[in-house]
């Protein structure tokens, strides 16, 4: 496996477990990826230590984005497997800032990955 994430030199945060970069194909201002240093494809292959280290980066990045961009909310997401939409098979967590009126109706949030399932 040769991860394109490891080639990115500009890192926002880093700890012994992982690092944070801006998403090259951001869906909103401030969209970040939290990435483990160890290359593995699936979140469910993470060790307990990795989950803790990545979660620490996730919270640190959330605070940074709140200060820098003042979003109104966040989506946190992981695509686990090809049929869940994963295209880079180096596990990563999306932290997507959301802004009032960035979509007509945000109801359902991540449920909208399946068209028509966001309303309930």
Regions found by a protein language model. Give the residues of each.
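HIT superfamily nucleotide-processing domains
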Residues: 1-120
